[in-house]
Each structure stands twice: as C-alpha cells, then as structure tokens.
Amino acid sequence: MAGYFFSLPAITQLTIPQQAAVGEPQQIALSGGPGTGKSVVSLWRHIRNYQSNPIKRSLLLTYTTTLKMYLADCCKTVRNEDFPDAGNLSSKNVGTSLKNSYKIHNTRFTEVIIDEAQDLSNDYYDGIVSPVSYGADDSQILYPDHCSHQAELKSLFPNNISHILDKNFRNTQRIMKFVKQAFPNANIPMSIIEGLSGNVGEWPVMQISYGNKYERSNENQDNAIESIINTLRADDHNIAVLVPWKKDAQYFENVLKNKNIDNSIYYEDDSRFPLGAKEIQNVHITTFKSAKGLEFDTVIIPNFNIIERTPIYIQREELMTEEYLTSMKKTIDRLVCLQKDHDILLSETERPDGLIDVTYRKLMCSWEDVFVACTRPRSNLYLISNYDLPYLNTVTEKVIL
C-alpha cells in the first residue's frame, strides 16, 4: 500500500503575496479561500523560523490530527545546508490546537502559528503567552458551537499585519465553477475563477446510482467507487473517499476491504484512534470535517444528494430517548425536536439508523462541510448521487450507473 504522496512547493515557487506573508517580521493575520495556500504559508513561516534560528522554538498548530500529520511530514522533506536539522526540529513542533492548549498558555515560544484559527472559540486565545500569527477563513467554519470569525480574531489580535491570499492554486477552473454553482452562500469571487484560466481541467462527474436515499449505499455506487480507484490509483496519485459521518466511513472501509483495495481511514473516535490519525495512504477514507486542510488528486463523494438535506444536527446515540426515536420515524417534511437542552434539526424525513453517529458531542453536517469536501481535489471530483440534481447539469458531466 503506497503512502500519501507529499508535495510541498519550494519557497521560491510561492507567489509574491505568499512570500510576503512568510517573511513578514511582525505577526500576521492570514486570510483567503480554500486552495489559496494558507496552510502552506503557515508551514513555511514555521520552517523559516527554524532555518533562521533553530532556538526560536516556533510552534505550528492546526485543528485536525490528519492535517497535523501532513504538515509535520512536509517539514521533514525540507533540506537546508545552513541548518540541516531545521526540517526535523520544525516537524517536532507541529501539533493540534486542542491538545496543546495548556502548553501555549504556560510555555513561551518565539511565535505560535495557528492554522484554521476559525475553528477555535474566543476563549481559547485568552492568555496565550507567546506572539500569535494565524490563518482563517469564515467560509470554512465547521464548528459553529466553538468558532471565531475573522472579525473577532482581528479584535483579539489588532496589531497583526493582514495578508490576504486571493488566488486558488489547488482546484481546476471547472471544479471552482461547480463549487460556485453548488454553494452560492460561499461567496466565491469571479476573480478566483478567472484566475484559473490556465488550469481549466475537467468537469466534475455526477454519477447517478438511483439507489434508496435512506440506505447507506447500493451496488451501483460501490462498484463505481471501485472502478474510479482502480482506474486512477498510482504511487504519486492521492485519492480520497469523503463522507459526512463515522458510520459512513466504516461502511466504505468494508466495501474497499471486500474489493481488495488497500486504504487508510480516519474519523474522530477516541477508542479506535486515541492518538488521532495513524497514517495517510494514497487511498484514504475520512469525514468531511477531518479532510479540511488536506488536498487530493481525486476526491469521491458518495451519496452526494446529502447536499439537499443540510443542515443535519444529531446527538449522541445514548442520549436518544424512545420518544425521540418514535418521532423520527414519522413521515413529515421538517422536524424539530427538543431533547433536554439541545435542539435537533432535520431538514427532511430521515430514518434514525441512517443518521445516528456515536460521538462525544453534537455533530452537524452543514453546507460548509460539503463545500470543504468539494474543494479538496486538485484534478478530479466524482459525485455519486442517488438521484438526479438538475440544477448542477451545466457544471457537471452526468453519468447514469
């Protein structure tokens, strides 16, 4: 099984705005949409701290363990004749935001760089003892219960120098045209799409399986996933199967196992992954939320018709009362249940066995989750839907399975 193919651009390959952010002597407030290079800039800023002076003790933090692993491994690929240990030293000081909360409130670093800063509450930043640089994007807020909008971050760090990245380096033009059509609330500027004129690419492929929308999958969909992977997989080609929930990830893990396709998998589960993601292979299954910050050559999203059902809120399985489960089975268009102090909102009728995901806190699948998933691919985006989505016909290539 081949590992995830890492490709960190050389610092000389960064654009002038990106290099300016890396080299800014003061702390920075970095912003920009998906694919504009926020994580790359944060990573290079962290590495350069060690290249210029290894005793600086820079600390780079991000929200998910998968992205933390990716960034740490990218550090190891950097070679510098003047400071040969800079890559390894910087790699050792990449961590996740939540697990390093105590450290940054009690240990002083020359600089703490927080990637995906919008995923942390305002309280998280109170009392950090080191200078803070950060990157954030309001359109990628996936945890509205504990987040910080860019305006709030600006108030928290008023002296940080703003650096705005406005060119997409990840996606093709046709993928971004699709994203703009599918997610009007994302407010994607036309300048982003026009800037991709040199990387037109192929239209996302919409495969219609005509399966039961209440079932996790069907034979047509499973076979389509197998065919896509077997056609495209290569040692230097990264493929992801992205899904909303843990149980979906587990299901497709079994599908690939039965089809003899090696893969890695990650979802938030303290029992199975007590230390977070263990590895990333070049065929990887994960949830929308855990995919944020990562990029793949090819992304496959099964059951894409979920886009029409967002937002979906669910609670821990053990908190579900019999009264709630009974009400869930009723055929109604919209259901709002109050369970103890928590609201549960379903955008349309759902069977509880298809939605309940055992977790330690309330889960949500919003349009932002699906938006993040659709902006992960560099080249190919495959969307498999149980039924036709005509409003996307002009920005997809349709295939009937």
Task: Identify the residue ranges that each predicted region occupies.
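Conserved helicase motor core of SF1/SF2 NTP-dependent helicases
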Residues: A2-T77, N106-E111, E116-S264, D270-V372, ...
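Conserved NTP-binding/hydrolysis module of P-loop NTPases
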Residues: A72-P84, N88
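Short glycine-rich substrate-engagement loop in P-loop NTPases that contacts/grips substrate
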Residues: P84-I104
